[in-house]
A protein has these predicted regions:
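Short loop/turn motifs that initiate or flank beta-strands
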Residues: 1-256
């Protein structure tokens, strides 16, 4: 111990006290240390030899334990973006961090170091390794990746001839442009629903849609917020043909 790492003074009961500085104590790693205090009478340095009597000394065992600190896991809640979550935490420990994840409700054995990217609720487990100064830390938490909202453009509608029904043919000429909000590269497509006019009668009719849905391996990562906006289509009159007429002779009766 260097001279600058301790102070000598009187204790509360009037006895001599040796106080180690905080800078010295914090420099020690966890473990046991033996401190020997030697006393030089009258401030004279002891010189061995002759009839000189060695000064008294005191031995003290100093035990330094590891500090117990916490770790705060930052929120990982987000809307689906096709990218794995990026975990982070605040802690005083300088130990190596290990992150593990599993679906919420799954057994502890399901933990894996692969960071999730798909929509769902997950459990996270952070382990901070023990160091010379700090105890091992283990923290858990929960976060949710929310499905991304997506909407469908209004499909093209075909006019038709009156047939007594409200059904209208609809289609997307460019299926890749049918959706707004899809992330490039995701496997996502539209399941076509039904289009129906507000009346089966002839005229320009308002058409609404039902039954449209999403398909593909990434469909669970999206939330279809509504059916396509309404459109319009024309129902035209159905041509009616009259067959041949038969004319019969008759006696005069004054009528046409």
């Amino acid at each position: 111990v260097r001279d600058t790492e301790y102070r000598i003074g009187a204790s509360a009961n009037g006895q001599l006290a040796i106080t180690l500085t905080n800078s010295f104590l914090t420099s020690l790693t966890a473990g046991s240390y033996t401190l020997t205090v030697s006393y030089d009478p009258l401030g004279e340095t002891y010189v061995s030899g002759g009839d000189n009597q060695a000064p008294a000394s005191t031995t003290v065992v100093l035990t330094v334990g590891r500090s117990t600190v916490d770790a705060d896991i930052a929120s990982m809640d987000k809307i689906y973006d096709s990218e794995p979550v990026t975990p982070s935490a605040n802690t005083e420990s300088d130990g190596v961090m290990t992150w593990e994840f599993k679906p919420d409700g799954a057994d502890p054995g399901a933990y894996t170091t692969a960071a999730p990217e798909d929509a769902g609720t997950y459990n996270v487990r952070l382990t901070v390794a023990e160091t010379e100064h700090y105890d091992r830390i283990e923290k858990t938490g929960t976060f949710t990746i929310t499905p991304k909202e997506i909407r469908l453009h209004t499909p093209a509608l075909e006019d038709k001839t009156y047939d007594g029904s409200t059904a209208i043919v609809c289609m997307y000429y460019y299926p890749e442009r049918a959706m707004e909000g899809k992330i490039s590269g995701d496997d996502l497509s539209v399941v076509m629903g039904q289009a129906n006019a507000d009346s089966p009668d002839v005229g320009r009719r308002t058409v609404t849609f039902t039954g449209f849905a999403l398909a593909g391996s990434d469909a669970a990562n999206y939330n279809l917020t509504a059916q396509p906006n309404s459109g319009s289509a024309a129902i035209t009159a159905r041509p009616l043909s009259i067959g041949s007429l038969t004319v019969r002779d008759k006696l005069y009766d004054g009528l046409n």
